[in-house]
Amino acid sequence: MNPTLSRGGAPSRFVRGRGRGGGAYRPYFYFRRNGRVIPAGGNRQPNQGEPGAPDAPSVPPATRQPRGWSRTAGKRGRNAHLDCSFLRPENYAAPEDGLQVQSIAVDNPRAYSGWRLYFLREKYEEGNELATRIMAVEAYYQRNPHTFDFVMIRDRGFFPLCAAGIKSDAQLKEVWPSLSEDIREHPLRTLGTLSLAMHTVVVNHQLDCNDSTTAMVSTPEQYVLPTPRVRKIYARPDDFVPVESIEGISHSRVDTLFSIRGFVSNVGEPSYSLTWQAFRCSRCQMEIAMRQRGTFQPRPYQCKRSECVARDEFVPLRSSPYTRLSIRQIIRVEESSLNLVHDFETSMPAEMDVELRHDLVDAVRVGQEVVVTGILKLQELGDDTTTGDTSNQMQPYLKAVSIRDASSIKREFSERDLEAIVMINAEPNSFKLLVQSIAPEVYGHELPKAACLLSLLGGKGAETEAINVLLVGDPGIGKTKILQSCAQIAERGAHVSGKRGAQSAQQLGVTFAGRNKRVLQAGSLMMASGGGHCTLDDVDKLASKQAVLLQCLQSEEVNLPLAGAFASFPAQPSVIACANPQRGQYDEGRYLLQNINISPSLLREFHLVYILLDKPSERDMSLTAHVRALHAGARKRARIAARYALKPKMSDSMCEVSLNVPAAGKDDDTIKTEDDNDSIMQQDYDLDKRLEVLPEEGDLDLLPPILIKKFLSYARQELNPVLNEDASNAVLRYFLELKGSCNLDEDVSSQIGAGQLLAIIHLSQARARLDLSHVVSPQHVRDVIALLTESITQTSLKEGSSRQGTRGGGGAGGGAGKSAQLRNFLELTKRRSAALGRRIFEFDELKEIGTRAGILTGFSQLVEMANLGGYLLMKGANMYEVVPD
């Protein structure tokens, strides 16, 4: 028993507080943070009135108070939350959902049965602003039954909400004029209002359906499932905010709505957790919901109703809508923007983590281009379990509220962009201007640049049809610069450098990353899927991943073998690659496969193959002047100069003026060339000279990469050209002549088929896109024929006059038939015999000659064929004699 107070009211040493020997006062419950003792009672909330005030909340009386405690109205009540605001820095922006609620009493009003699903603390007041807005949104949903399927929304648990429809409703605009601003600045509260209105409409629709039908009652013979309660419904807003750049997102705009566009580079493993658990009091039958965190599952220790004194026997409700099992997934989105140009060697596009919940989980796949709308949040880097970062810094992330596939969403161009595109198209030779603007530091090589430009424009089906280009040449010729320039101006590009060895090889296919190897990471082939372009520098050094590349080009998918499972991902990229010769310098006397380390099957997948050689020519003086001007800063990539006037273009193709074709505006049926009946392959048409910059023209005002990127994106998006009758006849004549030129070799002619015909058509359509033309003319086909002819000529041996080609010339010289191989082998053998002065050769010597002739497999069968044909005579064991002519 404590002694009584002494006279005068002086505190005794036995009394708590700052008395004699008692030390500093500490409450019964406290905790520490950063070395400071924080009382569990906390401070009075800013919105809490003084004791005795009219608006002061009433504190329910405690059932049992510990001895010596006198809880007043000013102290923290039973359901009051902790306030640690004094620990926050001065510039702290309180999040909208920062008020943590540990438990709630499910006391929904009669008008809204799902009120506590969306508003945990706010009480319903009839006639206030929130109630009026909810009723107005309900009326909007009921006025548009053709837009909202209430039965499907109840089953799915979410509904798409288009901004165009709800913003244009006049009745809703009168009640809620600031809807657009509220959903942008206060998205959580606004989306909760929109979702609660839909929840109420769905509940009323379900009640109407139950009243109209005869309710079945369970019997001992037949059990009838009870009608489940409607769970929480989520609104998925679309087009409420414009798409913004990830780099422009500021931390000061936390808890506001953002929209970004990009490619899904990483997909994490979904995690499941119980976030809320509903209980029912066994005495008063009141429903209580408690927040669940971690592995420990708390239970109510007292009833939320002040009249009830129950402290135990709370029954968990598994089927209650307030019992929520939350699904969470983290993905990483890489930015896709036409206003940014990245140098893949030194910088990478901006990335942002996105948190998916509920129905949005597993809604995307790696490599998919999406538009994500979400709420900006902050998190500690140390809390990220998908990566190994252990920093104390804060990074922004998006809490997604809606996700859409960006393949069907067109890109928007400003008025300034459209004016620049018109200026480029108004040039009399826009093809030449665009070709010269690609890698201007590389002098010459106009045809390889033109081939890369057509590959970036794609064919008719730009999402599924690819145009693959391979550049082979001596080191230092400028192949890497061309590839880097193509990666910068590609609308959807990925760059892989083979100089990094195994690290680059792992960037091709789909791999697992993260600390626990639970994050699915998209490779370059997946990031360039869907009409994108993957540039591979030194593809011959990626020997370990050439099988992955071949499979992607052939089957248009990337496989991922797993333990006990097998996964495949669709991938349709266009590949622009380069390779160096094995011996350091390209040998024109050897086949293409003997110069580079690429398999024949992979080589056949390239439609265009060009050999870039450093030969002495009359251009060397111009090359010297070009290099000097480049280092002096004279050839800088400037924007379109003032001389680009908005003038009408005289022709749809830059070749029509030089070919004496009637100007645009006349009937297309009258466009006929005087040599239509002659062979197209025999016409004297030098495309390389037409794309070359002449000395009298001076320096061109080259286009910047960002403008080329927008021009190519506009052409791919808005134009889908078709072949007219003249262009179709030109393609057919060239294809028949290409097939007829290989009639002497049956094996080669059998490889010229529909694939090569489709390649010519897709290249012609890409050439028409470059002129912003909706019709493919014969002049467009002529440019494509010039590119194909040059590719076939460069990749064939100088000694052979026949065009040995496969898919558009890509496998030229690499897949010759047995008869062609036999002719080349016998020709080299006779030359070797004449040089040595003898006709007897051993088998190893003949094999070496066959290797020089490009015969890598089946040499024994070839020697046997020569023996049976009488070209070689067997003179003993592994000894053969060359029969002279």
UniProtKB/Swiss-Prot annotation:
GO terms, biological process: cell division; DNA replication initiation; reciprocal meiotic recombination
Positions of the UniProt region annotated as Disordered: 36-76, 796-818
MCM domain span: 430-627
GO cellular component terms, semicolon-separated: MCM complex; nucleus
Binding site for ATP: G473, D474, P475, G476, I477, G478, K479, T480
Matches recorded under InterPro entries: MCM, MCM8/REC_WHD, MCM_dom, MCM_lid, MCM_OB, NA-bd_OB-fold, P-loop_NTPase
UniProt subcellular location: Nucleus
GO function terms (MF aspect): ATP binding; ATP-dependent activity, acting on DNA; DNA helicase activity; single-stranded DNA binding; zinc ion binding
Bias type Gly residues, positions: 806-817
UniProt keyword terms in alphabetical order: ATP-binding, Cell cycle, Cell division, DNA recombination, DNA-binding, Meiosis, Metal-binding, Nucleotide-binding, Nucleus, Zinc, Zinc-finger
The keyword Nucleus is annotated on this UniProt entry: yes
Main location: nucleus
A Pfam short name: MCM_lid
Zinc finger (C4-type): 281-308
Family label: Belongs to the MCM family.
Name of the protein in its database record: DNA replication licensing factor REC
